[in-house]
Amino acid sequence: MNKQKRLRLFCLLTAILLLSVSSSSLAAEAPVQPKPTLTLIGHASVKIKTADGVVIYIDPYYPGDYSEEADIILVSHEHSDHNKVNLCKQKADCVVLRVSDTINKKDVTYNTFDVKGVAIQPVPAANKNHKIDSSTGFVLTFDGIKVYHAGDTSKLTQMADLQALSIDYALFPIDGKYNMNAAEAMACAVLAGARHNTPMHYFEADPAGFTPENLLLIPYGDTVELEKAAE
């Protein structure tokens, strides 16, 4: 091989090496997209954080960490174990939605909201202790994921409508005090048809009594990463 060919080969190999190093460096520096998370603080108190960092608290009450400033606070009804909004640190533009915002009492229709990329759809929640015009559940849509928080409720025929929404994560009260017990909650899980079913609002009740298909048991205080359904 003459000197000129060796020089060309050297230059080619050098270029390939530099390109490889540059590509590896770019791959290493590419930011990792955070995953959305859900924390079951306790009772019916839930914290959701979207991939973009939007912080949502639902039914704040149970002792826990509310220190991350809220973008959105949702109150399903005004019982004292669901409405402790003052526990949450709030951003200056925090949106607080209570029953007076979400339900039109005259005809029991529901107002929907889109806040910071989170679609908020109130849905029926009721039983003998919670009037249909004074209580809601919520379906939240963000990052291609749907989360259903049932609020305080018993089984309702309207829950069958949730199947059409393709719920990814559903949370059901199970203690049987002012709402349904675990057996009735399992029937609700069948109606809703979510990919994951989680018990909440169980006080001294044993969450092990809630055994639906697709059970996702989240101990109080724990956080899980939320995943989109496989396409």
Positions of predicted regions on the chain:
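Bacterial N-terminal signal peptides that target proteins for export
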Residues: N2-L12
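Bacterial N-terminal signal peptides
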Residues: C11-V21
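Structural motif
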Residues: L74, V147-H149, L171, T198
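Sec/Tat signal peptide C-region and signal peptidase I cleavage site
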Residues: S23-A27
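A short helix->loop->beta-strand "cap" motif at the edges of active sites that frequently abuts
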Residues: V54, Q90-V96, G193-H196
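Cap/insert and terminal regions of metallo-dependent hydrolase folds
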Residues: S154-E231
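Di-metal (Zn2+ and/or Mg2+/Mn2+) metal-binding site signature of metallo-dependent hydrolases
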Residues: Y62-T102
